């Protein structure tokens, strides 16, 4: 009996987190089918898990970035620029996929519900204005409100200032960073319980009956996201690492995408991505910045959502649009979505702005937002899974490509001579 108990405890504490999450997923579905009141009640577990992730993520980002920059040695290489380039390339590629698929399989909407209680941004200037204001936010306010642009700005500034600090100060910062990382690991071990609660309560509260009216729209949306995750992203990664990208792609989808799918927040998934980068032995100076930055600005999924829903509204209203205009829409949508990917459902608030490019009235555009919330059970989950798993995928691809260059000086010299 004791031996059996010991094996069970070992599985809980040290077992595969992915297997435990799958068990929690199945158990949540079963409970929702068996008892709706019980399933809604265990939703508390999901709320606590997501709340814990959101609580620890800002502190984790602040401490990791400060520690990373403060201890940065002169001449030590980081690879932020190549990762940012991949983020941009991935977002525009996703937008292009959404445009092409929307023209091949045009969707229409049933515009009945309005969402008058939501105030979307009035234009791209307002979006960029808000983004710039986020950079100069009060550090305490940024931590309390999970403003990752502001947190990164302060962390970078403090990190640079602390480069000249005494070694004992730097050691203290490292110890604080390690302590926060340990807390994060403990929180992540509760992921199976959190997923169990989220799945059970979501299915019990909403079901999937409302989604039947929008089957084609969902097929186009999720089809675009799968195409980006399984075709476009692997092509980008292959271009970077020059070997089979799928082991890395599937690892990122399995360990980052699954959790992000249920938390529906790129910000809440930052600790999961950080832990995965650490397991892969990536450069901490790089991933401590690229992961939180990606949670805010890497918006491939948001670009797909905005483009597909806006073009669905265009097709519904019978507006004729040419391919260059549709592509311009996707570019504008991708730029505007910057800063919205860290908020559950944030990309939907940019739809009225995108619709305004085609002269669609705001009241009609808000009905499109209403449709977005109806399908949000799947749309927002799939979007977040794509966004968050892409953060760690592109970070790993760039870090591994840099490691390969360092391991092969001849190839590096040949690259310089070209």
UniProtKB/Swiss-Prot annotation:
Gene3D superfamilies assigned to the protein according to its UniProt record, in alphabetical order: Sodium:dicarboxylate symporter
GO cellular component: plasma membrane
Pfam families linked: SDF
Domain of life of the source: Bacteria
Gene Ontology biological process: serine transport; threonine transport
InterPro entries linked to this entry: Na-dicarboxylate_symporter, Na:dicarbo_symporter_sf, Ser_Thr_transp_SstT
TM region positions: 21-41, 49-69, 83-103, 142-162, 190-210, 217-237, 299-319, 331-351
Reactions catalysed: L-serine(in) + Na(+)(in) = L-serine(out) + Na(+)(out); L-threonine(in) + Na(+)(in) = L-threonine(out) + Na(+)(out)
Subcellular location: Cell inner membrane
Membrane topology: Multi-pass membrane protein
Keyword Zinc applies: no
One MF term in the entry's GO annotations: neutral L-amino acid:sodium symporter activity
Keyword Transmembrane helix listed: yes
Keyword terms of this UniProt record: Amino-acid transport, Cell inner membrane, Cell membrane, Membrane, Symport, Transmembrane, Transmembrane helix, Transport
Family: Belongs to the dicarboxylate/amino acid:cation symporter (DAACS) (TC 2.A.23) family.
NCBIfam families in the record: PRK13628.1 (NF010151)
Protein's job: Involved in the import of serine and threonine into the cell, with the concomitant import of sodium (symport system).
Entry protein name: Serine/threonine transporter SstT
Organism: Yersinia pseudotuberculosis serotype O:1b (strain IP 31758)
Organism placement in taxonomy: Bacteria, Pseudomonadati, Pseudomonadota, Gammaproteobacteria, Enterobacterales
Gene that encodes it: sstT
């Amino acid at each position: 009996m004791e031996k059996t108990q010991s094996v069970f405890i070992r599985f809980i504490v040290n077992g595969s987190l992915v297997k435990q999450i799958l068990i929690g997923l199945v158990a949540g579905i079963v409970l929702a089918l068996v008892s709706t009141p019980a399933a809604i009640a265990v939703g508390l577990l999901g709320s606590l898990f997501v709340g814990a992730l959101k609580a620890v993520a800002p502190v984790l980002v602040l401490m990791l970035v400060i520690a990373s920059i403060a201890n940065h040695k002169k001449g030590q290489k980081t690879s932020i620029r190549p990762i940012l380039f991949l983020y941009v390339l991935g977002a525009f590629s996703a937008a292009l996929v959404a445009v092409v698929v929307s023209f091949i399989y045009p969707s229409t909407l049933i515009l009945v519900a309005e969402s008058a209680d939501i105030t979307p941004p009035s234009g791209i200037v307002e979006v960029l204005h808000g983004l710039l204001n986020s950079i100069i936010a009060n550090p305490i306010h940024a931590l309390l409100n999970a403003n990752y642009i502001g947190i990164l700005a302060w962390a970078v500034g403090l990190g640079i200032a602390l480069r000249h600090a005494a070694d004992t100060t730097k050691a203290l910062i490292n110890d604080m960073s390690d302590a926060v990382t340990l807390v994060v690991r403990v929180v992540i071990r509760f992921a199976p319980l959190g997923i169990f609660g989220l799945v059970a309560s979501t299915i019990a509260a909403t079901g999937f009956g409302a989604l039947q009216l929008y089957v084609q729209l969902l097929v186009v949306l999720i089809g675009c996201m799968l195409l980006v995750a399984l075709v476009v992203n692997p092509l980008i990664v292959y271009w970077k690492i020059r070997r089979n990208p799928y082991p890395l792609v599937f690892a990122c989808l399995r360990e980052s995408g699954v959790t992000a799918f249920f938390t529906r927040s790129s910000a809440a998934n930052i600790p999961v991505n950080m832990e995965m980068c650490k397991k892969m032995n990536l450069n901490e100076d790089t991933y401590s910045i690229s992961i939180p930055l990606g949670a805010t600005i890497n918006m491939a999924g948001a670009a797909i959502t905005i483009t597909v829903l806006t073009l669905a509204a265009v097709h519904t209203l019978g507006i004729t649009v040419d391919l260059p205009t549709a592509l311009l829409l996707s570019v504008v949508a991708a730029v505007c979505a910057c800063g919205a990917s860290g908020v559950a459902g944030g990309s939907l608030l940019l739809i009225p702005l995108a619709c305004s490019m085609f002269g669609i009235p705001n009241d009609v555009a808000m009905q499109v937002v209403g449709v977005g919330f109806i399908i949000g059970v799947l749309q927002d989950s799939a979007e977040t899974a794509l966004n968050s798993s892409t953060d760690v995928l592109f970070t790993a691809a760039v870090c591994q490509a840099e490691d390969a260059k360092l391991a092969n000086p001849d190839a590096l010299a040949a690259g310089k001579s070209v």
